[in-house]
Amino acid sequence: MKLAFLFRTAPYGNAISREGLDALLAATAFCDEEEICVFFIDDGVLNLLDGQKPELLLQKDFIRTFKLLDLYDIEQRFVCADSLDQYNLQAEQLIISAEKIDRTSLINKLSQAEKVFTF
């Protein structure tokens, strides 16, 4: 894997996750899908939670844009099982499919990337 995108921050309160998603989608123009990996850990798993109502916070709904990962054929998607447990979330509650892996496995996979972008 060439590029890893690591989402660690919650979706609202700042623009970090939205900017990370924009960077991820832009990277697909320059890299093959197989060269890109996406990871969600800590508060970053909240970016994948279905049924959010950002308009109540006067925020734009960019969360649905994560569904474009299917359209862009980005299949290497991983979510930290420990982080899901922290929020009592199940894979069925996420807007996209992602492989659940433990924190140690996630860190091992991240170490294989040439570049890691953290958001």
At which residue positions do the language-model features occur?
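Residues at the starts of beta-strands that form the adenosine-phosphate
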Residues: 2, 34-37, 76
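Short, conserved beta-strand edge motifs with alternating hydrophobic and charged residues
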Residues: 5-7, 37-41
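Short, glycine-rich nucleotide/cofactor-binding loops
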Residues: 5-20, 52-53
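Histidine-anchored nucleotide/phosphate-binding helix
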Residues: 17-38
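Short beta-alpha junction loops
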Residues: 42-45, 81-84
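N-terminal beta-loop-helix "entrance" segment that forms/cooperates
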Residues: 44-56
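A glycine-rich helix N-cap at a beta->alpha junction
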Residues: 54-81
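Low-complexity intrinsically disordered segments
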Residues: 84, 96-118
